[in-house]
Amino acid sequence: MTGYQLVKYLTSAKYDSYQASTSDLPLFRAAEVLLNYAEAKAELGTLTQDDIELSINPLRERADVADLSLTEANAHPDPYLASAETGYANVTGDNKGVILEIRRERTVELLME
């Protein structure tokens, strides 16, 4: 534990009450659109490295995380994410590794929303 408190969407009590709030809450973030795009292309079997460069990698670059490689992800699917106990055991096929990585990215990106 770091001791840091989550302050996402937190506003002053001066502006919020039991019956009303002036805080805008995005219902669909641009990051979620990019993740949905990449996952849909991967599930259809049409995902390319160019698609990853337009969708997943900008999200990872913003967090200073290494770029995702389609070839590398599919060559070495994460066993933790593929496990029936801890992940998505139902994911199969040629794009198994990259689908698992996209789902991990979604978990990280949308945490606490």
Give the residues covered by each predicted segment.
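Acidic/polar-rich alpha-helix caps and helix-coil junctions
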Residues: M1-E113
